[in-house]
Amino acid sequence: MTSTVIDIPDTVRAKIDVRNLNFYYNQFHALKNINMSIPDRKVTAFIGPSGCGKSTLLRTFNKMYALYPEQRAEGEISMDGENLLTSKQDISLLRAKVGMVFQKPTPFPMSIYDNIAFGVRLFEKLSRSEMDDRVEWALSKAALWNEAKDKLHQSGYGLSGGQQQRLCIARGIAIRPEVLLLDEPCSALDPISTGRIEELIAELKDEYTVVIVTHNMQQAARCSDYTAYMYLGELIEFGETEKIFIKPHRKETEDYITGRFG
């Protein structure tokens, strides 16, 4: 099966360029010759059935696999012209540029304030007043400030599930990354909390490049500007979300979107 790759228009700047990317778990070939460009300050959604490789692809963007010696990536992932796969850049600095929010809310076992301040302290030396401002800024960006401002020194575990996920997003943007990766951020949330996260995603793209993995096709249609459909480790189709959902080029894409998949 060959992929239909529709690069972004020339008028849209690419933040991440993926070329001939292959990924392996030991001998298992999980990603097969992926080629795509992730547009800057847009929301790109990865959709596809379980096990298709969408989360694996997402995690190559901040080299999460580097923690596991049996995993390896080959090819090129360039951000602003630098190949992340061959770069000798410190991994922690890369992850300051490319933040990530996981499927299950993962607040640190500390106060709401320190959840936000923790990552900032790793990369910046701020005065107390500057840190206070940064914490308020991040929580405000994540639409959590009004709910959390009176309990900043209480545990993040005391927040609801939706609030915890917004706390994780606030923690991710507090270090002012350039890219924000969201791996199924709403799968464990109720519809109201999901709606809040989707509204937040729409606001974040004004300042960040956002890439979201989702099993929820309606969510992809609502939130994203571009959509990639993946199957069995291959990129089947990639393009503007409206075109992917209304008039896809590939029958495989149409079958998945219309529920005829399988």
UniProtKB/Swiss-Prot annotation:
Pfam families: ABC_tran. PROSITE patterns: ABC_TRANSPORTER_1, ABC_TRANSPORTER_2, PSTB. InterPro entries: AAA+_ATPase, ABC_transporter-like_ATP-bd, ABC_transporter-like_CS, P-loop_NTPase, PstB-like. It comes from the Bacteria. Keywords: ATP-binding, Cell inner membrane, Cell membrane, Membrane, Nucleotide-binding, Phosphate transport, Translocase, Transport. It is found in: Cell inner membrane. It is a peripheral membrane protein. GO terms for biological process: phosphate ion transmembrane transport. Gene3D superfamilies: P-loop containing nucleotide triphosphate hydrolases. Its EC number is 7.3.2.1. It catalyses: phosphate(out) + ATP + H2O = ADP + 2 phosphate(in) + H(+). ATP binds at residues 48-55. One of its GO terms (cellular component) is plasma membrane. Residues 16-257 form the ABC transporter domain. NCBIfam families: 3a0107s01c2. The complex is composed of two ATP-binding proteins (PstB), two transmembrane proteins (PstC and PstA) and a solute-binding protein (PstS). Belongs to the ABC transporter superfamily. Phosphate importer (TC 3.A.1.7) family. This is Phosphate import ATP-binding protein PstB. It comes from Cupriavidus metallidurans (strain ATCC 43123 / DSM 2839 / NBRC 102507 / CH34).
